UniProtKB/Swiss-Prot annotation:
One of its GO terms (cellular component) is large ribosomal subunit. The gene is rplJ. InterPro entries: Ribosomal_uL10, Ribosomal_uL10-like_sf, Ribosomal_uL10_bac, Ribosomal_uL10_bac_type, Ribosomal_uL10_CS_bac. Forms part of the ribosomal stalk, playing a central role in the interaction of the ribosome with GTP-bound translation factors. It comes from Prosthecochloris aestuarii (strain DSM 271 / SK 413). Belongs to the universal ribosomal protein uL10 family. This is Large ribosomal subunit protein uL10. Coiled coil: none annotated. It comes from the Bacteria. One of its GO terms (biological process) is translation. One of its GO terms (molecular function) is structural constituent of ribosome. NCBIfam families: PRK00099.1-1. Part of the ribosomal stalk of the 50S ribosomal subunit. The N-terminus interacts with L11 and the large rRNA to form the base of the stalk. The C-terminus forms an elongated spine to which L12 dimers bind in a sequential fashion forming a multimeric L10(L12)X complex.
Length: 172
């Protein structure tokens, strides 16, 4: 590969990594073409981009990313890079689910908002709520609070009427 092409790839990967909320490194050695296509489709469904780029080029691109120096430690053997732009957790869920069915996919490391996670931390990452799940939970809490406001107001009004009624009886 010529130097110009390498520089272009580094520039493109750097731009993608700088925009990313979550960066995941995987080892895909032993996955056949059909399994790789299936993995890419799973990532695509949740809005994650999966790329295979030479380790030396990814290492160069990671120089400008928070946590990139630590993440570069995971650049060995064959490396696939999963880049999550909207939700940093969904990629972990895909990797965990896919690696249970395909032992040839191995999680190496991840960086989420500058924090680096080791391979042993994949189950914890995958068990975290995704952005959509968190929004749903907050919406449910807000909905419950809004629904309870009329009941609280009615209870206060009922108690006020009761107190006023008792005060009126005492004055008589």
């Amino acid at each position: 590969m010529k130097r110009d092409k390498k520089e272009l790839i580094v520039q493109q990967v750097t731009e993608k990594l700088e925009k990313a909320q979550g960066i995941y490194l995987t080892d895909f050695q032993g996955l056949d073409v059909a399994k790789m296509a299936e993995l890419r489709n799973e990532f695509r469904k949740v809005g994650v981009e999966y790329r295979v780029v030479k380790n030396t080029l990814v290492k160069k691109a990671l120089e400008n990313v928070a946590g990139g120096d630590r993440l570069a430690e995971g650049l060995y053997n064959t490396t696939g890079v999963a880049i999550g732009y909207d939700d940093p957790i969904v990629a972990a869920k895909v990797i965990e689910k896919f690696s249970k069915k395909n032992e040839n996919l191995k999680f190496k490391m991840a960086a989420i908002d500058g924090s680096v996670f080791e391979a042993s931390q994949l189950p914890q990452l995958a068990s975290m709520l995704s952005k959509v799940e968190n929004i749903g939970r907050v919406a449910g809490l807000v909905n419950n609070m809004v629904a309870s406001v009329p009941m609280v107001v009615n209870a206060v009004m009922r108690d006020l009427v009761s107190v006023l009624d008792q005060v009126a009886k005492q004055k008589q």
